[in-house]
Amino acid sequence: MNVYTTDRIRNVVLLGHGGCGKTSLVEAMAYLAGMTSRMGKVEDGNTISDYDKEEMKRHFSINTSVVPIIWEDTKINILDTPGYFDFVGETEEAVSAADAAIVVVSGKAGIEVGTRKAWELCEQYKLPRMVFVTDMDIDEASYRQVVQDLQELYGKKIAPFHLPIRENGQFVGYVNVLQQRAKRWKENGEVEKTDVPDYSKENLGICREALMEAVAETSEEFMDRYFGGEEFSEDEIRQALRVNVAEGSIVPVLMGSNILARGIYTLLVDIVKYLPSPEKRTCTGINAKTNEVYNADYDFAKAKSAYIWKTIADPFIGKYSLIKVNSGVLKTDDILFNQHKDVEEKVGKLYVMRGNKPEEVKELHAGDIGALAKLSGATTTDSLSTKTNPILYIRTTISTPYTCKRYKAKNKGDEDKISQALQKLMLEDLTLKAVNDSENGQTLLYGMGDQHLEVAASKLFERYKVEIELKRPKVAFRETIRKKVDVEYKYKKQSGGHGQYGHVKMTFEPSGDLEQPYVFEQCVVGGAVPKNYFPAVEKGVQEAVLKGPMAAYPVVGVKAVLYDGSFHPVDSSEMAFKVAAMQAFKKGFMDASPILLEPIASLKVVVPDKYTGDIMGDLNKRRGRVLGMNPTEHGYQEIIADVPVMELYGYNTDLRSMTGGSGTFSYEFARYEQAPSDVQEKEIEARASKVDRAEE
């Protein structure tokens, strides 16, 4: 592939709801740009972007793909992202590497939850954007409704650039709102000028007014002239658009049909014309040597530096670190320093990815997106630079996974293979986490949703030929007591020769601190138990609390006091007193009104106002306690509640169902509380075989 300078580069991320047409838009762009001889289809599994077997099987995007489109001697790096929320980590990575966005909206489906989330991401990363309305070949599609809904949500910055022309239910042409001229497609795909149809003139007036209003909002001078009834010249409008679209204060709305490849030409032209090249954006890091701010700003003349925004670790194509060059020019065989890993690595060859196909390139200029192969220790969010000028860039914030299932190998002996395969998946996917829960004897897999975990399990089989079973995770309970008891236990064994003797009198009571397993004290007088055996008695308590007598869960919140006992000058030993203390604990615990404690999570749920009643009702069913509500932006409410952890299983799926995908949640462990009696009974019964009872 040819080398492109910074001013001839556009990095554009496609965002939008799942199924709105992002991948088919890429196909239309690639076809129109002459990259392909025919357009692939998502349902046929032959698109440039959706190359993964899981994507082909499921007919939707799972990974972000880079597809460079060459248009008017400009390299447009299109980042095609998943629209489904389970794969939001891929989208967040792509947004961090982009300089602008196209929010794709289906003209038939209209504004969806994914549209709003896409807009929020653009706001978060301060990305200038366009909206492209697809499906205009479908009779039920309404461009006008989409524009109106966008204006209601986001105000006067929404600027419709085009207006569709329909005849007999067919999408046959468009009106250019700026030029107030119409064009019609001929059978060979070319366009010809035509008169604006009479039936379009009213809508043209409405769209023209919206465009002028958006331009007027950009300066006081324009605002005064607009309210004075003065017209703007076409050159003034174009200049205002060039500046303000790039700054994000005007959002153009375009439209077309991906299937017919109509409206794509004007989209590509406007991407080059209005969306900013990297040199128009800012980019800062920290010099690790001096701790000073480093203004990279995609300046090719500065020392070379780059940021790894995504990793591909596929056994079929190898490992590639996808980078964005933040400053300087990277060349073949460069030596780069990874400040995060404190290691220098030789770059070798430079690549540009086209879907899953790497193409060699001699150099990558500041602002360009490329790939490096087989960097040994590099991972996503690492910074690369020279050792003399070590730069650190802010790591991309990736969503925290809260959906959890336990997993185990379907076939015995595959455990090590599964562990290694998961490490490779997690190298690619920062929202996938494997955690060993030794307390409950389980391994847990965290993801963004059930579908995410199912895809991960499927990838393990497709790529690495290992299978896992996903099941509901066990919840870690605790045991404690509610009253004080006095216990005596004498451990005495004689089997000829040297025997064992340990005798303790102890009290056990609630300590009042559920964050500590136990508190140990002694108040022995008269040497009934020699001091040198006190540590052994405490050791007995320490070991006993690891596995409680009720359900074999760890014990918390117990105060143990040794106040009396006896010893034998020959047969007593540390082991004997340790065993005596352990048995005293087990015996006394069951007489001290024991209970099971369950973990409680502090939950935050953010939903639109209209769903708050449903959410609070559902939380009540989950034994939750709503503690408060706080209004947030755009008509949303944050609901704060305490909920038992065991009741949060499946909450991600249920919340999406209740809110149409618009609700989000997060939680963290808060404390342990007494579990209801029915929950305790079930848990005690289920774990009866694990319990060690006290010896008589």
Regions found by a protein language model. Give the residues of each.
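Structural and coupling elements of P-loop NTPases
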Residues: M1-E696
